[in-house]
A protein has these predicted regions:
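Catalytic core of non-heme Fe(II) oxygenases with the double-stranded beta-helix
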Residues: 101-149
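Non-heme Fe(II)/2-oxoglutarate
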Residues: 1-85
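A short, polar/charged loop/turn motif at coil->beta-strand junctions and beta-hairpin connectors
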Residues: 2-5, 90, 123
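Generic beta-strand or strand-like secondary-structure segments
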Residues: 76-80, 95, 117
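A residue-level signal for beta-strand positions that form part of recognition/binding surfaces
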Residues: 8, 93, 128
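Conserved active-site beta-strand element of glycosyltransferases/polysaccharide synthases
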Residues: 98
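A short coil-to-beta-strand element that immediately follows conserved catalytic motifs
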Residues: 86-95
Length: 149
């Protein structure tokens, strides 16, 4: 299996297009509402439950930690990830980010609790991920990359 050998594998169409599109539009709407809430001071500027634009990895890009929609996806996809990795996994956290044109997530090492991680494209244009220099992986909406964090 790819994961055992290479440390990553791509799973096509893990989420059906209507499901991926629904979650994608949900996050676009959540970002819009969060922007209104912050600008109109309905919520404190240091609040994070509606999402933030201050993540140091990709500043100025909307992201949200532990959203119930992504926590649900995490739990639902856990059996598939355990099968792919041949490991008993424990959910640690979910994190969603809406990339915009020009955003770059530079090479980094995930925290220790992310021994196995996943990236899931929910919507927008296909975009490349570079696992290692010269290894480009393109994900369409609904596709998922499982990798050693």
């Amino acid at each position: 299996m790819d994961f055992e050998k290479k440390g990553y594998t791509v799973l096509k169409k893990v989420l059906d297009q209507p499901v991926a599109n629904f979650i994608y539009k949900y996050f676009l709407m959540k970002r819009k509402i969060a922007d209104i809430f912050y600008k109109n001071k309905y919520i404190p500027p240091n609040s994070s439950e509606w999402g933030i634009w201050t993540d140091i990895q990709v500043p100025g890009t909307y992201s949200v930690y532990g959203d119930i929609a992504m926590e649900t996806v995490l739990v639902e996809l856990k059996p598939l990830m355990e099968k792919i990795t041949n490991k008993n996994l424990f959910e640690t956290y979910s994190y969603a980010r809406i990339y915009k044109k020009g955003d770059v997530l530079h090479k980094h090492i995930d925290r220790f609790s992310c021994e196995v991680s996943t990236t899931l494209n929910l919507g927008g244009d296909p975009w490349p991920i570079y696992i290692e220099p010269g290894i480009e992986i393109n994900l369409d909406p609904g596709d998922m990359l499982v990798y050693r964090g």
